[in-house]
A protein has these predicted regions:
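Charge-dense, helix-prone N-terminal extensions
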Residues: 1-121
Length: 121
């Protein structure tokens, strides 16, 4: 996938199933952090608040991913993520099996709290 200039452009370039899954994830992230702004970071959609990135998301050949930016957050919710592939810094999910909204909300709110406590870049 070519580098996208916006989150909308990134999503438009995704296959339909991945686009739908990431649109759903985008909605959950925005609900948990309405003050967050969208950006492209590391050639992926990202959400920024308090001057820092909260989370990234991306579409790949066989899965979609949420990148919380904190392995500690992934570990804290490992039980709730049973059935999803958890790798170094990422939570992978198939487009037909979205992440639970409650877990996304907890992760995003925890990242908001982390970022609020850090100095602005």
């Amino acid at each position: 996938m070519a580098a996208a200039a916006s989150v909308d452009a990134y999503l438009a370039a995704c296959p339909e199933d991945s686009r739908a899954a990431l649109e759903h994830l985008r909605t959950m992230i925005k609900a948990a952090a309405p003050e967050a702004t969208e950006t492209i970071s590391y050639q992926m959609p990202a959400f920024r608040a308090h001057g820092r990135i909260l989370v990234w998301m991306g579409a790949f050949r066989d899965h979609c991913s949420l990148f919380p930016g904190s392995m500690a957050l992934i570990e804290a919710h490992r039980d709730e993520l049973a059935g999803y592939r958890v790798a170094k810094g990422t939570i992978q999910f198939r487009p037909d099996k979205p992440l639970p909204a409650a877990v996304v909300e907890k992760i995003v709110k925890a990242r908001l709290a982390e970022n609020a406590g850090r100095s602005r870049r």
